[in-house]
Amino acid sequence: MYYGFDIGGTKIALGAFDSTRRLQWEKRVPTPHTSYSAFLDAVCELVAEADQRFGVKGSVGIGIPGMPETEDGTLYAANVPAASGKPLRADLSARLDRDVRLDNDANCFALSEAWDDEFTQYPLVMGLILGTGVGGGLVLNGKPITGQSYITGEFGHMRLPVDALTLMGFDFPLRRCGCGQMGCIENYLSGRGFAWLYQHYYDQSLQAPEIIALWEQGDEQAHAHVERYLDLLAVCLGNILTIVDPDLLVIGGGLSNFTAITTQLAERLPRHLLPVARAPRIERARHGDAGGMRGAAFLHLTD
């Protein structure tokens, strides 16, 4: 059995998957906020319950936001303060007496999609998350590409390309990102960015679902906004795809539920790619909330 944990600031979710990559059992508990000991106990108790349920010693993979293992072997995860700064992988491996593998949650999302039955045919899979922020991951031949600092796929912190300023206007404001830099694309392409762009151009404060509802009703202003957003997304993706050249692009996050993104993006991409380049197949993520657990579990499929 393959056990996958999706750990965030509010919940620890465990999914148990069989050898055919099918979910057989899942359970969620609250994430301890202050006690590292309580955090370790919560994870270990879930593993013990799964081992007893299935009568085997399952493998353990964990997806968590942040940098799973820094140079000194400790976790950096601002949203999981009980475990941040602690040698989580080493401590869990010792307590559970097995090889525990960690990766960040965005890489686990990409890995989950790459191991979908329909998508395993594609050697290079790029996962793109358009949610509260913009992130993603890369999977090559079934294995995540992490980089030395676990930041491979942090597409949201690329800066706006010059073509974006040509599209939006050279007086377009470069917003300061939470990372400290100016003009990171997640400030414009995330769900928050989608809403900010609408407010910037129309001086109306609406959330992304409200704007999308107007678009679905045929509202001309919402239609113009979506066209502008899709053009900006295509411009920014053009740079990324020229570097990565994936076979498959899978889009997740809240905005992936907006069908215009997956259905209308492909026609916009070629003008931003090299003449010899082909746009990848573009699909919406298949596994929703279970994706984090799946990808974490499948860290042990990469041997």
Swiss-Prot record:
Q: One GO BP annotation here?
A: N-acetylglucosamine metabolic process
Identify the domain of life. Bacteria
Which amino acid positions bind ATP, per UniProt? 4-11, 133-140
Q: Which GO terms describe its molecular function?
A: ATP binding; N-acetylglucosamine kinase activity; zinc ion binding
- What InterPro entries does the record tag this protein with? ATPase_NBD (IPR043129), N-acetyl-D-glucosamine_kinase (IPR023505), ROK (IPR000600), ROK_cs (IPR049874)
Quote the EC number: 2.7.1.59
What the protein does?
Answer: Catalyzes the phosphorylation of N-acetyl-D-glucosamine (GlcNAc) derived from cell-wall degradation, yielding GlcNAc-6-P.
The protein's name: N-acetyl-D-glucosamine kinase
Source species taxonomy: Bacteria, Pseudomonadati, Pseudomonadota, Gammaproteobacteria, Enterobacterales
